[in-house]
């Protein structure tokens, strides 16, 4: 129920930012994916519907080329499948992903403000510094490794948090948005808080 509410607000944020438009070309594709995943995870139908809807919207906005859409659609299908596989296998892993994502964002913000220094990609993320990013990466790496994960996997997961954040920051800059919404006062919207886990879950 909580996850469904979170995803509902994400959809609302995308609608408010005018991300949602002209998706009628994807009704058939949406239906096929919906049926496929329903067979695999019949008890997660509402959450899956929300996720697919969100990412079909993103595909429509950012990938006007037909073949790119198909390639990206496959990657999104993998993402959704992995996400709900995690939920069904072990909810503790799901909660761990949320915790690591929150920890990484918080550390990057705090140390970026304290130490400051040069920015990484000012044109995309004007507040993200090298100091905050490196410290959050190192601490996240050790936390992930502490829970019996191989060191290489821990590194990949820690790096993925950064790229998820940058990816959604790029989307916002392309659409002249500071945040997806102001639902969380001073912290943007729900989607702004969950962006870093996008590639984390896929890995």
Q: Where does each model-flagged region fall?
A:
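Final/C-terminal transmembrane alpha-helix of multipass membrane proteins
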Residues: 193-203
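Hydrophobic transmembrane alpha-helical segments of multi-pass transport and channel proteins
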Residues: 159-163, 190-194
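Short amphipathic alpha-helical surface patches that serve as generic macromolecular interface elements
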Residues: 153-156, 164-168
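Residue-level preference for nonpolar/small residues embedded in alpha-helices
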Residues: 103, 163-164
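Membrane-embedded alpha-helical bundles of polytopic integral membrane proteins
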Residues: 1-127, 133-158
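Cytosolic, membrane-interface loops and tails of multi-pass inner-membrane proteins
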Residues: 106-128, 167-189
């Amino acid at each position: 129920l909580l996850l469904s509410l979170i995803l509902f607000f994400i959809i609302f944020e995308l609608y408010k930012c005018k991300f949602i438009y002209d998706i009628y070309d994807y009704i058939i594709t949406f239906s096929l994916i919906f049926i496929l995943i329903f067979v695999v995870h019949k008890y997660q139908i509402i959450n899956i519907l929300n996720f697919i809807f969100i990412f079909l919207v993103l595909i429509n906005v950012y990938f006007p080329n037909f073949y790119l859409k198909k390639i990206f659609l496959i990657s999104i299908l993998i993402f959704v499948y992995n996400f709900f596989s995690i939920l069904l296998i072990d909810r503790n892993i799901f909660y761990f992903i949320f915790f690591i994502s929150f920890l990484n964002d918080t550390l990057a913000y705090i140390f970026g403000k304290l130490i400051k220094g040069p920015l990484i990609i000012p044109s995309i993320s004007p507040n993200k510094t090298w100091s905050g990013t490196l410290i959050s990466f190192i601490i996240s790496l050790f936390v992930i490794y502490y829970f019996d994960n191989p060191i290489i996997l821990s590194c990949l997961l820690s790096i993925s948090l950064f790229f998820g954040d940058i990816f959604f920051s790029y989307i916002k800059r392309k659409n002249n948005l500071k945040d997806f919404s102001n639902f969380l006062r001073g912290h943007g919207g729900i989607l702004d808080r969950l962006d870093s886990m996008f590639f984390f879950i896929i890995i």
